[in-house]
Amino acid sequence: DKSDVSANMDETKYKATPNQYVGENTTVEEVITNPAFGDFGRLLFPVDRTVSEDMTLSEVSTSSVYVWYNYIQVDKTVEIINSLIDDANSGNQIFYNVYSEEEMQTDSSKRDTGLFFFKGEENAPFAIMNAGGGFMYVGAMHDSFPHALEASKMGYNAFALIYRPDDPYADLAKAIEFIYDNADELQINSNEYSLWGGSAGARMAATLGNSDNLAQFTGRTDIPQASAVIMQYTG
């Protein structure tokens, strides 16, 4: 139901103040309880991995949390989080549920999904970044947030998808549907978009970047095929 999905557009804007910026010694708990992140702060970190709220950003930015990844830079983690706080301070909505409240009540696992929005220029094309994690977890902080941030700096409207490792293709299809149906409110160009991904995310991008698969997963033929698919790497 588009009306249910569109209700997400009217959520309260989450704001923070400059003294709530984070640093490498900020704890996970302090991040997820920051007013900028409302009730979705936990999704900044992998919900399918054990991440203690007592860990600092320096401690969490390691391959012990983000398994299979190396060269994780806490400075980039800090930059990403503070950039989102800045966007919230500016009155921008930085997170969207892609499923309706009714859908999430029916299937609580859908609460572990959503789109972090790194806003670019008005009516510019959009991109959806899909992190890897071996279909075991979503390594967004290291494998999709940095790409979304840099794309937004270039003017593109970038979304980083938090998906369920057990149902990734359905979640990406729902995300594409949500963005397409709410393009006017999001102030984006819905006719030109790209799908990005690394590892598991690359497979997601390649699958949903195919028009037949897109129609199969969405049940619709009105949504255009992605203009580009960027498969960074996959195993």
Where is each model-derived feature located?
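Short beta-to-alpha linker loops that shape the active-site pocket of alpha/beta-hydrolase fold enzymes
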Residues: G133, I162-R164, G235
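Catalytic nucleophile-loop/oxyanion-hole region of alpha/beta-hydrolase
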Residues: G139-D143, F159-S190
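Short beta-strand element of the alpha/beta-hydrolase
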Residues: A124-G133
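N-terminal targeting or regulatory segments adjacent to alpha/beta-hydrolase or S9 domains
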Residues: D1-R111
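A fold-wide structural signal in alpha/beta-hydrolase
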Residues: F126, S152-I162
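Short amphipathic alpha-helices and their capping/turn segments at secondary-structure boundaries
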Residues: G114-G120, R220-Q225
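Primarily recognizes the serine-hydrolase "nucleophile elbow" in alpha/beta-hydrolase
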Residues: K174-G235
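A short loop-to-beta-strand scaffold at the N-terminal edge of the catalytic core in hydrolase folds
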Residues: D107-K119, P125-F126
